[in-house]
Design a protein with these regions (language model features):
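Glycine-rich cofactor-pocket loops
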Residues: 19-23, 237, 242, 248, ...
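Glycine-rich flavin
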Residues: 27-35, 40-159
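Active-site glycine-rich loop that binds ribose-phosphate moieties when present
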Residues: 105-108, 167, 189-203
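Glycine-rich phosphate/cofactor-binding loops in nucleotide/flavin-utilizing enzymes
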Residues: 125, 327-365
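DPxDG-like acidic metal-binding loop motif
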Residues: 150-194, 330
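Glycine-rich beta->alpha junctions and the first turn(s) of the following alpha-helix
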Residues: 203-276
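Generic structural signal for well-ordered, non-transmembrane alpha-helical segments
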Residues: 259, 272-276, 308, 312-319, ...
Length: 365
């Protein structure tokens, strides 16, 4: 695991209970995160980031999740959103990342609608775009949009400096579709002062992630606020922006299960062998895929599939192992004020994330 100094680790863990009580990361936890640059794990040094490789960043996220589930999850989701710096237009990225406390939050669900605004001549501002352009395959599409939407689960909302969100595109009152019938979706960036935060995060665990909803209504934004998460659309040259987003998301979430399960086992006893074997398989899969990405040859499909499978296996085994041990922990594990109870609640709340949730046999969910 990443070697976080013992005194720092003790301070972060010691503040976890108070962070849960107040419903968001403790100010002293945040101060450490900013000082260490953890929201910028995958941001280039030229933008003030740590510029870590994926395996290096994963080990930090794992260790933070071991110290405090809400802390690890928040750093993971926010550093994942800050990773979008590679796909933002440089003039926008420079302004955002001039703030040492830059922290992006957001949602991947297309729960907003961006209406193409027409100019006086009746044409979309910026010129008429083909369908492939709207989908981000061939540069600028329209020019200006009016966005309305509400998005759930924006981890780190209270301290976010900007928000990202996916929207369907509407033109002439019609929601556009791609040639295969799927909806045309674009990613947008909103500044903090442009959104309304709705404090509705009420769950049994991961309380201090403060994963509230946010909304915009009739917000006008230009084409420079749109971006596409695709290596072909990256503005920055680092290998991390060529690593496929699906595998990146799976791996970064999975290590949080590993960190929380490791801590749960530490609190229960020394039963580590099973989790250790799954951990080794996971990091081997990530390392293999990362090395291919760094070589610039593209990551083979089978290696990406191995990352996905190892991530799901890691999350599933973490859940199973914790649930096997829970009945042996006594009443202290059922008391909300104890660390072992908080770890259990955090892990089981995190396990509801759809990316790594087990498939339902009848396909109903």
């Amino acid at each position: 695991m990443h070697n976080i100094p013992a005194a720092l680790a003790e301070m972060l863990r010691g503040l976890a209970g108070e962070a849960e009580r107040i419903g968001h990361l403790h100010p002293e936890q945040l101060a450490i995160v900013y000082e260490q640059g953890w929201f910028n794990l995958f941001v280039p040094r030229s933008y003030g980031g740590l510029e870590l490789s994926l395996p290096e960043g994963l080990r930090i996220e794992e260790e933070l999740a071991r110290l405090d589930g809400s802390l690890g999850w928040t750093v993971t989701l926010c550093s994942g959103a800050n990773w979008f710096v590679g796909f933002l237009r440089p003039e926008i990225a420079r302004k955002l990342f001039a703030d040492r406390r830059v922290c992006l939050a957001g949602s991947g669900r297309p729960d907003g609608v961006a209406r193409v605004i027409r100019g006086e001549d009746g044409e979309p501002r910026g010129g008429v775009g083909r369908m492939s352009e709207v989908n981000g395959e061939e540069g600028s599409a329209w020019g200006e949009y009016e966005v309305t939407g509400r998005w759930k689960y924006a981890t780190g909302a209270p301290h976010a400096t900007a928000f990202t969100a996916n929207c369907r595109i509407e033109k002439d009152g019609v929601l556009l579709e791609n040639e295969d019938g799927s909806p045309v979706v674009r990613a947008f960036l909103f500044l903090r002062e442009e959104v309304m935060i709705q404090e509705d995060w009420e769950v049994i665990g991961m309380i201090a992630t403060a994963s509230h909803s946010f909304a915009v209504r009739g917000l006008r934004v230009g084409e420079d606020r749109c971006f596409r998460i695709d290596g072909r659309a990256a503005f920055l040259p680092q290998a991390i922006y060529q690593y496929p987003f699906q595998a990146f998301a799976e791996a970064t979430l999975a290590v949080n299960f590993l960190g929380m399960a490791t801590r749960f086992i530490e609190l229960c006893g020394e039963v580590r062998e099973r989790l250790g074997m799954v951990r080794e398989t996971f990091y081997t899969a990530v390392q293999d895929s990362w090395e291919e990405c760094v070589r610039g040859r593209g990551v083979p499909t089978e290696l990406l599939a191995a990352v996905g499978e190892a991530s799901r296996q890691l999350a599933d085994e973490s859940r199973r192992l914790v649930d096997e041990l829970y009945p042996l922990c006594g009443l202290r594990a059922a008391r909300p004020g104890t660390e072992i109870n908080r770890v259990w609640r955090d892990l089981h709340t995190a396990s509801q994330h759809p990316l790594l949730r087990p498939a339902i046999a009848d396909g109903s969910l």
